[in-house]
Amino acid sequence: MSFTPSHIKLYQNGELKQRAETAFQILQSCKSCPHNCKIDRTNNEFGFCRSGNLPIVSSYTAHYGEEPVLSGTRGAGNIFFGNCNLRCMFCQNFEISQNWKVEREHEISSEQLAQIMIELQKRNCHNIGLVSPTHFSATILKSIYLAVEKGLSLPIIYNTNGYDSVEMLKLYNSVIDIYLPDLKYGDNQSAKTYSKIDYYFDEAKKAIKEMFNQVGDELVYDGDVVVRGLIIRHLVLPNGLAESEKVFKFIAEELSRHVHISLMSQYYPSNKASNDILINRPLRESEYEKTIELMEKYGLYNGWIQEVESSESYRPYFSEDRVNPFKDYKSSSSSFPKEGT
């Protein structure tokens, strides 16, 4: 199979350029995410994400630690954006997501971001992975347009925390090939407590429904690598704090039982988690096994589950090495060992 990303056609008919221009206007009264800060980021005003109108790229690399159908044999061309529109106490990428004064030093132009995409394509990566793009979603579209103009022809992954604006996602329709959202919590209160965010579950459900409407529940493959579709990630938290059953119930009853889920066990008490008695320890095997049973209870069998020991192997070190922050990652397809039918 030879897959042609749909953003190529959007570029050819002029639609991609128009959407990039429309998206950038949103920054003048920012509604890039459900915070709806309505500040003018084009005039150096900062809202919750503490970001201006220029994208912050903290790191970019060929990454082998995604689901095997995304990393393949040549890696996902991941671009890690700095800052964030959440404040997770346990964030594993906190060195770049919650250190805004330092990350502002890594602002780049739209043209430079486009060139990074081209560089990752030249490295023979399978795709372009936009990691934590939400708060820069209004500016990234311009870079995609410029990159396609320079010859970008790879599928694009939107790897997000799920707290996205439906308005922005509609502008990304047929631009994004693979949606890779987190669905962190099945409860608004847990999200407020541990990610300092209002109405997370409500807003994430709306966003993921929009993603589902765009790409459906089927994964499209080119060889062994996915080139189009939706994969929902869910990180299991200690003491059931992610309200996982509500997450599975939503997916099964409001999306489809055929949706692919990446159920993650890689939680460890990073960032400020050691200060909270309920999350200051790794996940127990019994907790993870119970969560798998809940997933199966709702007829969700498509996707991947991690080995419980994954918390020992997935630990990024952005402060030590921005070029290769995952140098100690133990890349293996057994990290996500089971795919359903």
Label the predicted regions.
Residues 1-45, 216-341:
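Auxiliary Fe-S-binding modules of radical SAM enzymes
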Residues 45, 49-178, 187-188:
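Conserved Radical SAM active-site core
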Residues 97-98, 137, 162-165, 183-201, ...:
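Conserved radical SAM core fold
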Residues 77, 128, 156-158, 179-181, ...:
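Hydrophobic faces of well-ordered beta-strands that scaffold small-molecule active sites
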Residues 192-222:
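Anionic-ligand binding region
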Residues 81, 132-134, 158-162, 183, ...:
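A cross-domain feature marking catalytic cores of carbohydrate-active enzymes
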Residues 173-188, 258-267:
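Non-cysteine beta-strand/loop elements that form the S-adenosyl-L-methionine
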Residues 95-105, 193-198, 275-282:
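Short glycine-enriched, charge-decorated loop/helix-capping segments at active-site entrances
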